[in-house]
Amino acid sequence: VGSEMCIRDSSLSTSDHSRLEDILDELNSWAETDHVSLSLPSLRVDNFSQSLVEKTTKVRKSGLTFAAEAGTQRLRDVINKNVTWDQIERGCRIAFAEGYTSVKLYFMMGLPTETLEDIKGIADTAQQVVDLYYSMEHPKGKGVQVTISVACFVPKPDTPFQFCAQDRRESLREKQKYLLSCVHSRKIKVNYHDSTTSFLEGVFAKGDRRLAPVILEAYKRGCYFDGWEECFKYDTW
């Protein structure tokens, strides 16, 4: 009695599904009665709508994550992510109008042709979202929390950037420090992916079947749940 469950979709590009809203309608036919909330993963802002918000907030408001991808329009164009600030603003405006007081913005760091200006653009984008929130009417005392979530770019085979160099761990750490120095609001929180884990991911992405014995040996030496920072044993790897 009084308990609540959450169905969370963790797939990629969920909002691309042609019948997503029909699926949400079907789930909501019983979810609200059974106190089950629905949550979606990182969303493309160009596919985000007020209708989508309404269908995922019937029990409670779960987190919203928008894939902003890069800090500047120049870099978003380089990686062929057709996301504009106008679309980001529209998505956040819809969310704030529906009562959301926190959003997460997903970015990548270490992208080809990236400069410090692009890193600064990540902080600038988050600040613009904060400013957008306070430009709208809200109940007194309601504040906003914008979380920047930054992953490290890893070149993958059979992609346009497969032959691009991956940023060195030292370079990524410097960029992460620079990003933190560009954030000046307590309304903005920064989370970033561990560069050492990304280095291993790059090794696995470029490797072949000859890596299988390495992975098995690491397992035998106690490397379990390496996606969790507290369990990651880089020295063992």
Segments the model singles out, each with a brief description of its role:
Residues D9-L12, A151:
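Glycine-rich beta-strand-to-loop/alpha-helix junction loops that act as flexible
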Residues R8-D9, H35-S39, V103, V146, ...:
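Acidic/polar loop patches that form or flank catalytic/metal-binding clefts of enzymes
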Residues G2-I7:
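Short, small-residue-biased leader/transition segments that mark boundaries at the very start
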Residues S15-T147, P155-K175:
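Conserved AdoMet/S-adenosylmethionine-binding subsite of the radical SAM
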Residues Q176, S185-W237:
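Radical SAM enzyme core and accessory elements
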Residues L43, A151, H193-S195:
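Conserved beta-strand termini and adjacent loop/short-helix elements that scaffold enzyme active sites
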Residues Y134-G141, L180-Y192:
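Flexible helix-coil linker/hinge segments at domain or subdomain boundaries
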Residues V150-P160, T197-V203:
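Short, conserved secondary-structure transition motifs
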